[in-house]
Amino acid sequence: SIFFRIVFFLVCMLYFIHGLNGSPREWNVFTEYFTERGFDCEAINLKNGLDLKRVHFKDYVEKVSGLVSNDDILIGHSMGGLIVQKVAEETIVKAGVCICPAAPNDIPMKTVPWWRQIRYLPFMLFGIPFKPSFGLVKDVFLSGWDEEKQRKIYNRLQRQSSHVTYEVMKQKISVDEKKISCPLYFIGRKEDVTIPLKIVKRIAQKYHSNFDAVS
């Protein structure tokens, strides 16, 4: 497994950070795998204890920063990968692993078509947490998958802060790579249509980091 590339670190904890509409349960297979091999693991519930009507991306960054020490490794997917980048900028950790990460504002990503964004304007304007429709998720984020699998994934998704959704999807988050002192490692998925390999590669290049692609 490519994850053995990080095993040479002597760590106190492996912290796993979920994506935008995800939850800690998406990491169950990973935490079980690494726990069986002697690692202490925690899948962070970003939303726990926070008011989704008020929370912003920086609140998630502060939450993760408050949990980790400089001996720990952060592993994040999608938005969680962007949180890894931001935490590494603001504090000291052993290393970070970013899986199909959302990009900071200097690396343009594919956006949701404007006409599919209109229905979510009231949520954005009034700070109402929401979960995108199955149609949007199916067509934009899970295209190419069979519908049974699309439904299974969609049913696991959770509501997210409209503020955080706006900040991530509209790429309002900046990261100063010169402030990052730990190694970062990036993983992209060959078939990913939301965050294509070329985007993951550009993010890795921003930090002069290693990059791998998986099927």
What are these regions (language model features)?
Residues 201-215:
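Catalytic histidine neighborhood in serine/cysteine hydrolases
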Residues 193-199:
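Conserved alpha/beta-hydrolase "acid-adjacent" motif
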Residues 180, 186-188:
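Short beta-strand/loop motif that positions the catalytic acidic residue
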Residues 92-127, 164-172:
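Flexible "cap/lid" loop of the alpha/beta hydrolase fold
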Residues 14-49:
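Short, surface-exposed "cap/lid" segments of acyl-processing enzymes
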Residues 47-72:
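Active-site loop/oxyanion-hole signature of alpha/beta-hydrolase fold enzymes
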Residues 75-80, 84:
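Gly/Ala-rich beta-loop-alpha elbow adjacent to hydrolase catalytic centers
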Residues 19-23, 78, 190:
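Active-site glycine-rich loops that stabilize anionic/oxyanionic intermediates
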